[in-house]
Amino acid sequence: SRMKSNSEKNYVLDFNTTSSLFKEEVQLEPTGGNQRWSMFSSLGSNEGTVYRDILSNAFIRKQELLGKTFLIKDTLTKSKWTMTGQTKKIGIYTCYNATQEVESEVRAIQFGRSSQRASENKDVPKKTKITTLSTWFTPEIPVATGPSFYSGLPGLILEVSDDNRTILCTKVVLNPKEKIKIKAPKKGTVVNNEEFKKIQEDKIKEMREQFGRGRRQGGGNRIRIQN
């Protein structure tokens, strides 16, 4: 057996052929009720709740930010996957490996006075980081979805990994006795993806300025932001 990390969370993916809902699981079994569900263990980040319309690629992500709830409504761009030819078993399912190169912006924001006024604390210029995203999907469950935003393959994605996290399916239940209702999240401030990124950046800047105005002398902290 292995120890469970403090940063490890359990999620459930409810899905049918037209929609899916990925959310953190707080119960041992999902209640309330569609046709299938699978349980994932995620190590490395907070995914929030993600609802996807599989046919249109539209999504709604429910995300908390400093005590406020946002509903991020937008459309996923089509992913360009490369099949590697590798296969492996995840549980009883034969899975195929697909990868893609993902470009993301990484910035470091410096906190602290260090003999400077808060207004002089500048953002470090944005840097672009390329990471390889690796997924394992099974055509034995022919539904083009997966955990979080991962999708676009001819089968259910059961495992995803990159430099920062791994999301692994630990259980799949097809046609459960209790029907599962897939409902899009509704409560929250509605924004699109770009608007939410801007809100995140503004909040970080606000925190930095408040920190700089505080009594703390010298030293500092650095926060890495990856979009």
Question: How should these model regions be labeled?
Answer:
Residues 1-227:
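Extended soluble regions of mature proteins
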